[in-house]
Amino acid sequence: CAVRTLVSDITPLIDLQSKYDCEIQASAFLGTSPIRQYTEGWNMEKILSTAEKAVSFAIENDVPVMFVTEDTTRSKPEDIKEVYTRALELGVERICICDTCGHVTPNGVNKLLSFIQNEVIPDAGFKRRNIEVNWHGHQDRGLGVANNIAAFESGADVIHGTALGIGERAGNAPLDQTLVNLSLMGVISNDLTALDEYIKKAHEYIKIPLPRNYPIFGNDAFETGTGVHASAVVKAMDKGDHWLADRIYSGVPATDYGLKQVIRIGHMSGRSNIIWWLKNNGYEITDKLVEYMFNV
């Protein structure tokens, strides 16, 4: 449960844990960047004091804490180190590094996570394997998925995302695209064939647009009307080689995600598009009909 790093925000979690006899993690967030400090009139002494009071209160009352630094990617290294060190000393076992404003690039993700895992955690007296490192990215520069992949490659234990990148401003890193890319990289082996239905439900219930050209799950993602492209796909299908058909003109194999290649007829179509479309829609194929449709 996301909470501000305040005793008043953590108190209800204590009551809920008692009422329902289950642990509720407090994802306690606190801004650390110079721009936030200047805006709020904070200094590091204030930030550390706030963190100490809230984290100590949570741990003393058996509320598990993930300590979240907002705007980590625009924070000073020395400030990041100081606040995470204090949180770890207080008993925090999970931390979350945030690109709250969608500021960082993949190279920056790698450098930041390397700094935290190879310097901050061990210098605080802890073994990296005993601390869960989370990455939370945003999409302001369109780098959410690339940064998620960089975070994975840099050793983050947990990668955050949302369906269709739903979130404030330009949104969070898209969970769906992150999963597809990780599966294509061979680092996860989950069955993702239900992901399309999940995305369509998110689109339906949350009323967020799903552009036709949205990667993987947009209606046009595996559709072609171009003659040369369609001809190659048809040749692969005629060979009975669906593996080939899925890849000859697509960087993502549709069937791995419960989808399929679609051939349409358009202004750039060739005769192979027309023949394939007629065949798959139950029409008798004649030279006259094919020629007529081609010239319309």
What is the role of each PLM region?
Residues L6, I10, M44-A51, I80, ...:
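Generic structural signal for well-ordered, non-membrane alpha-helical segments
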Residues E45, R74, H138-Q139, S189, ...:
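Residue-level marker of alpha-helix boundaries and capping positions
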Residues V104-P106, K111-K239:
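Catalytic alpha/beta core domains of metabolic enzymes, predominantly
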Residues C1-A2:
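A glycine-rich helix N-cap at a beta->alpha junction
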Residues I188-V296:
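A mid-to-C-terminal "edge-of-domain" accessory segment
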Residues T72-T73, C101, D140, G165-I166, ...:
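Conserved beta-strand edge residues that scaffold enzyme active sites
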Residues V7-V133, I149-S154:
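Alpha/beta enzyme core
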